[in-house]
Amino acid sequence: MKQLIQTILKTGPLFLVIAFMVLSGCQQQKPDPSQEQKPILDKGIAIWNNGNLDEVGEVWDESVVRSVNQLPDVKGVEGMKKVISGFRTAYPDAKLTANEVIFAENKAILRWTFTGTNTGSGEMPPTGKKIKIWGITILHFANGKISREIVAYNNQALIEQLGFAMIPPKGSK
């Protein structure tokens, strides 16, 4: 009996270590969200950079909603096509760069830089000026596509780089 107790005491810690390793190794690992989301994000950035509007529906969901600063929401694939086309018209050499991306389950946060030369017509007359702005975008994914896009950037920095100025209202001191 004494020998049995000694054997159990000697092998007990080893048994506990093996049991712990087996049980913790059996836990199902969560998939890395970047595996699915990064190719979608990369293709979206490529579309912004090359202007291939035929591929927009491969990246953005039909019911996508895009919110930017305080502007009205853009909805659907056709809305995304108009936004991308508008930027590509105003800035024919537009380049969107992902500086940092954080992937999470069904979401990604993107810190980006946008550069281009304002030689095309858009909401404002072309100025011929080069711009460089950065912003943050929160992307939501569903069914392998972007379903929601929330964008924030400093619009005043953009306006100033284009050569426009903020004029205070009359009567302000």
Predicted regions and their residues:
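C-terminal and inter-domain tail/linker signature
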Residues: L4-I5, P13, L23-K173
